[in-house]
Amino acid sequence: LCAEKKFSNLRGLLYFTDCLKKPPEAYEHDMKLWWPHNEIMISSLMLYRDTRDEKYLEWFEKTVAYCKEHFADPEYGEWYGYLRRDGKPTMPACKGCTFKGPFHVPRCLIMVDTMLGEILAR
C-alpha cells in the first residue's frame, strides 16, 4: 500500500506531504484527518475480502486500533476530526464543523460491517 511508508514512520497518516520535500502551505498540513483513516479501513478490508491476502487484514486491524485509540472519544462518542502529529486531538478539539459532517465515519462503519458479514459468511 502507498500508505505503508507514511503510516509506519509517522504513526498514523498525514494528509499533506510534499513530494519534493518543500514546506507545505495548507493550515492542516501537519494534522492527521479522520477521513483518510476511514478510507484506509474500507479499502484494506475490501482488498482482504477480495484477495484473502493477510497483509490487508493486518492493515485493517492496525488502522482500526489506531482510530479507536486516537480518533474515537469513548466518553462522549463520535470521532475527533483532526489530530496533531502525536495523535492527540487538536485544541480546541473538533468533532463537527463545515468540513466534518456526519458522512465519513457512519459510511465507513456501515461498509465495514457489511464486508465483515460477507467475509464471515464464506
Where are the language model's segments positioned?
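Glycan-recognition and catalytic cores of secretory/periplasmic carbohydrate-active enzymes
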Residues: 1-122
